[in-house]
Amino acid sequence: MRGYLDLMKLRVVELLLVSTLPAMVLAAKGLPEFGLAFATIFAGTLAAGSANAFNMVIESDLDKLMARTAKRPVVTGQISKKNATVFATLIGIISLVIFWIFTTALATLLTFIAIVFYVVVYTMALKQRTAQNIVWGGAAGCMPVLIGWAAVTNSLSLTAWAFFFVIFFWTPPHFWALAIKYKDDYAAAGTPMLPVVATKGRVLKEMWFHTILMIASSVWLILAADLPMWSLAITVALGLVFARQLIALKEGSTEYAKVAGKIFQWSITYLSLLSVLLVVAQLLS
C-alpha cells in the first residue's frame, strides 16, 4: 500500500490542492457546502495522484539516473509498470466519476484536461525537449484553481483566471529553484531544465520576470475578487518578500544551490500564506 501512495506523490498533491479550497471560497463568496468541498478535494487528490503515477511509469528509466528519484517504487521494482499503469488509470477514472456525480460537468471536463495535459503534453512532449518545459507544462498545476471554481459555479470568471495566472507565474521560479538545487541530477537524466542548459544570469532574469508577473497577477486577483484593501497590502508584501529571495540568490552566488533551496521552501510558504489570506479576506469581507 505504501508503494501505491508513493506513486501518487501526496506531498506534491497537497501543494496542488492548497489553492483549490481558496478558489471554492472565492467562488462561493463564503464557505462552500461541506459535501461539495470534500468531494472536490478527495477527487482532486485522486486525479493528481493519477497524473503523478502515470508520470512515474513514463519516466522510470530517467528516474533511475537521478539520486533524488532512484528509490521511487517503479524504479526499484516494488511496483511493476503494468500494475502502476492500472492503478493510475483506476484512480483517474474514479476521480472523474466523483466529479461528475458530486460536482459539475465543467469541473469534470477540466479535471480530464488536467490529467491529459500533465501526462501527454508535459511529461511526454515537453519535459525532455525544451528548457521552457515547466513554463508551459506547469499549466497543469494551475488547473486545481479552475476546477475548484467550476465545482462551485459550473463556470469560470475573471477572478478564477486571475488566480490561475498567479499559480502559472509562481510555478517557474518555484521549480527552477528546485532544479538549481538538483542541477546535477537533471543533467544526468538529460532533462533540459533551464538551470541545466542556461547561465545563472539567464536563469535569474527568467525567475525575476515570472515573479514580477506573479505579483501583478496577485494584485489583479485581489481587485477582481473585490477583497478588502488590507488584503491587497499583505499580498503585495508577500510578493516583495518572495522577490527578496531572488536578490539573495544573486548575492549568495558562492552558495547558489543552498540559497536556491531556501527559495524553493519559501515559494511553498508564499503560496500557503496567500491561500490562507484569500480565505480569511473573503470570510471577513
Predicted feature locations:
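Transmembrane alpha-helical segments that form the membrane-embedded catalytic/substrate-channel core
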Residues: 46-54, 116-123, 165-183, 215, ...
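Hydrophobic alpha-helical transmembrane segments in multi-pass integral membrane proteins
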Residues: 146-156, 214-221, 270-285
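Interfacial loop-to-transmembrane junctions
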Residues: 243-273
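Multi-pass membrane catalytic core of lipid/isoprenoid biosynthesis enzymes
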Residues: 68-109, 199-223
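Cytosolic, membrane-interface loops and tails of multi-pass inner-membrane proteins
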Residues: 1, 58-79, 176-203
